[in-house]
Amino acid sequence: MRKINCLAFLCLFLLCSCTALTPQNAELWTGRFSVASKSGTSVDRHSGSFRLIVLPEKKILNINGPFGTKIASIEETQDECTLINSDNETIKARNSSALVYQVIGIPLSIDRILAWLKNERNADDFNSYDLKVSSEDKGGALRIRAEGYVPSTDSQVTLIILPRREP
């Protein structure tokens, strides 16, 4: 019985030590997303979850697939932005807008995504680079929809984000 208690304590200790704590001064957003890309007659659909941590010195955006597998992690500081994909390949740029443009052909920054999540009504942030963005707040549940044409892939893209701010 004593061995079982020790084993249970050890497992509990390991599980607790694996959780990532968010600092007090961090702003934390989590949620789900779906992306549909139409090119010609083919349609690609993807979905997953995200976690955005905003700290005074950096922003971290983790993007996961539908079953929690890592798709990419983006970390932006004042001087540089780094993306690490699921194959652990690293891509760097001067900021998140340049990085996302380099990867998928849309200059979309973490700051612009954060403005969408906060439901800020700045027309320049919401509708730029051929993205038409709308949001609706139904009983505290925000739904963001961005639609636009991506020249680099010659496709029409629709992005839907269902965010929530963590306490």
Task: Identify the function of each model-found stretch.
Residues 58-107:
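An acidic-aromatic
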Residues 94-167:
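Mature, soluble, non-transmembrane domains
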Residues 14-17:
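C-terminal motif of bacterial Sec signal peptides marking the signal peptidase cleavage site
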Residues 29-40, 83-84, 104:
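Charge-rich amphipathic alpha-helical interaction elements
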Residues 19-22:
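Bacterial signal peptide processing site
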Residues 35-72:
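Post-signal-peptide N-terminal segment of Sec-exported extracytoplasmic proteins
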Residues 1-8:
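Bacterial N-terminal signal peptides that target proteins for export
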Residues 26-32, 56-60, 138-146:
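Short, hydrophobic/aromatic-rich segments at coil-to-beta transitions
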